[in-house]
Regions:
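Surface-exposed helical/coil interface segments that assemble multiprotein signaling complexes
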Residues: 4-53, 58-226, 248, 268-272, ...
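Tandem repeat protein-protein interaction scaffolds
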Residues: 216, 221, 230-233, 240-246, ...
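Conserved hydrophobic beta-strand positions in leucine-rich repeat
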Residues: 161, 186, 207-210, 229-235, ...
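Canonical leucine-rich repeat
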Residues: 217-218, 242-243, 266, 289, ...
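Conserved "Asn-ladder"/turn position within leucine-rich repeats
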Residues: 166, 191, 212-214, 237-238, ...
Length: 607
């Protein structure tokens, strides 16, 4: 391929034309005909378990960025992963993902701030995707409903159905295209239509509706009949406000992803899902939950009697085909409570009492505890399998019980705490619990007024990722950096959204022999940040690979020491201010003198 391209005209038009017609070139050009055969052999050389995982990728559209977490949890639900030699199903599936990356069968998509896993997302190269689609169809594994797809005959025992955003068929076409009684997964990428769920789908295990438009509350009632479901994603379905009680019948459910919905309360019946391992929620609405659960019930009666006929006439703002129940849910669970309690945190969910019954939970978040009783927090303490917990709504009434709860979760690896009261510092919570955090904690996120970092944070020898921000108001930049610089395992550091008290002259300095393991540094919207300096007279951040600087209402005056960072690969500078030619010129000069030849990416714009 390289030799062929080297002999082509070096013009943008020619290369663009080749890129658009690469499949045809591979078929017609004798010089390139060997490439597909090589790629096919790379597929055929995969072990059986990786072949299944690779063919599964044909579900996703062209050039689609596929989340590692999404893939891993779907593979688990499909039975592609199992516990092996003491490794959990998630660890095994993660290993499969990395094996496909290492074999270059799938391509990594790197984000500015990676997770503990290193690679968060992947893509399929167009040529590998063609192989995946072809083989998956040959084996009746995956069928894609898309514009131009043939539905003239019923497909035999198709396992996975993907509905593309450009498919405009009707119910008759849908039911004639696939034998619904055999499908194990349904993935919708476009607009939701009610006939996508059928009582014939008796063995459906995976229902992935991430980003689907037109899905409203009353559609969820039909999903409750699919009792073999193990994975449900409603992520970014932002017209969903409430889960029905009937979802308590989904006793096989392992993963429930509600991030980006407007759900604020979980029904009591959720505690029947004793196999649930992953519960994700982070809303996108104003404060929308009641303090004791009584207000929405009373408002529902009022709304049903008086308001619905009028409101339903004005429901054009809701996507899909909302009925009176959807509109009433919106007003009674969102609008009225929001007006009553404007100061509540706009994100997170309220979990029901008896959440302790969900003993299999590994991941729980984002939980809003602003008005949770002590018994609710004690319930969370009994979730002894928890590896990841995210909590918001911390205030002076609940912080002591929260500290006690976290202390009791000995297996916790990731913790996020968001404080919502400006009248009291998160400092009080952390000062009162010097042994608060499990020693094997790997990821910690602290949002709220801190004033200073406690000395005990230096005892977190296993901490790999740390994020501090949202009005943390740390008073001493140097003291903060000295404490953090001593963490031996810290690889990812994010300081964001006013982590320091605004002084107008903030200078962040990375001293010699500090941050021995730091690989990713993200400084985001630190108002008053004037300079970032890496001391050149010694080993400073010797493993740093990625530096991201993001700012809005200010300009950096100086960035220095980049030429001495031995492993630096990439510097990203972005924000909504004009480029400072002097600073950018200095950065380019420093990077040109860095022996590792790091890449500079600049994305500055003005509103």
């Amino acid at each position: 391929m390289g030799g062929f391209l080297a002999r082509q005209p070096k013009t943008l038009m020619e290369w663009r034309k080749f890129n658009e017609h690469i499949s045809a070139e591979l078929e017609m050009n004798t010089e390139l005909q060997r490439i597909p055969n090589v790629l096919v052999k790379s597929y055929e050389g995969l072990p059986y378990h990786l072949k299944s995982c690779f063919l599964y990728m044909s579900i996703f559209p062209e050039d689609y960025s596929i989340s590692r977490r999404r893939l891993v949890q779907r593979w688990i639900a499909e039975g592609y992963s199992s516990e092996v030699r003491g490794k959990s199903m998630e660890e095994t599936a993660d290993r499969y993902f990395m094996e496909l990356i290492d074999r270059s069968v799938i391509l990594p998509v790197r984000k500015h701030v990676p997770s503990l896993k290193g690679i968060d997302s992947c893509q399929l190269h167009d040529l590998m995707r063609e192989i995946s689609i072809s083989r998956a169809m040959d084996e009746n594994l995956v069928f894609r409903l898309e514009e131009g797809s043939s539905s003239s005959k019923t497909q035999a025992k198709i396992r996975h159905v993907a509905i593309s955003s450009n498919w405009e068929g009707d119910k008759c076409e849908f039911e004639s295209a696939v034998d619904l009684s055999h499908i194990r997964s349904l993935t919708v990428f476009g607009r939701w239509r009610s006939f996508f769920i059928s009582e014939k789908m008796k063995f459906l295990r995976v229902l992935d509706l991430e980003g689907t438009s037109g899905l409203v509350d009353h559609h969820l009632e039909h999903i409750a009949r699919l009792i073999h479901l193990k994975y449900i994603s409603l992520r970014r379905c932002d017209d969903i406000y409430h889960l029905p009680d009937s979802w308590g019948n989904l006793r096989q459910l392992q993963t429930l992803n509600m991030k980006g919905t407007r759900i604020c309360n979980l029904p009591k019946s959720i505690t029947h899902l004793t196999k649930l391992q992953y519960l994700f929620a982070r809303g996108s609405t104003p404060a929308c939950f009641s303090l004791d659960g009584r207000l929405p019930n009373d408002l529902a009666k009022l709304c049903g009697a008086c308001c619905v006929p009028k409101l339903l006439k004005d429901a054009e703002w809701m996507d899909g085909d909302p009925n009176w129940h959807d509109v009433c849910t919106f007003w009674c669970h969102v609008v009225f409570p929001s007006l009553a309690w404007m100061k509540l945190d706009p994100y997170g969910i309220v979990v029901p009492r008896s959440v302790r019954k969900l003993k299999a939970l590994h991941t729980l978040g984002l939980v809003n505890i602003a008005d949770s009783s002590k018994s609710a927090l004690r319930d969370i303490r009994k979730l002894t399998q928890l590896r990841k917990l995210a909590v918001t709504g911390i205030n002076k009434k609940n912080y002591q019980e929260l500290c006690s709860t976290v202390t009791g979760l000995s297996r916790l690896e990731s913790l996020s705490m968001e404080f919502i009261e400006e009248s009291m510092s998160l400092q009080s919570c952390l000062d009162d619990a010097t042994s608060l955090l499990p020693k094997n904690l790997q990821s910690l996120k602290l949002y709220g007024i801190l004033v200073r970092l406690q000395d005990w944070i230096g005892g977190l020898q296993s901490l790999v990722k740390l994020e501090i921000g949202r009005l943390a108001c740390l008073t001493s930049v140097d003291a903060t950096m000295q404490v953090l610089g001593k963490l031996p395992s810290l690889a990812i550091l994010s300081l964001m959204w006013h982590p320091f008290i605004m002084t107008g002259n903030i200078r962040v300095t990375f001293h010699r022999e500090a941050f021995p393991s730091l690989m990713v540094l993200h400084l985001k919207r630190i108002d008053g940040l004037q300079s970032v300096e890496f001391e050149e007279a010694g080993p400073t951040t010797p493993k740093l690979e990625l530096l991201v600087l993001e700012y809005a209402a200010y300009r950096l005056r100086s960035i220095s020491g980049l030429s001495s960072l031995p492993r630096l690969k990439e510097v990203v500078i972005e924000g909504s201010v004009p480029e400072d030619e002097e600073v950018m010129g200095s950065v380019r000069d420093q990077l040109s003198r860095n022996q590792n030849n790091p890449v500079l990416k600049i994305d500055l714009f003005v509103y």
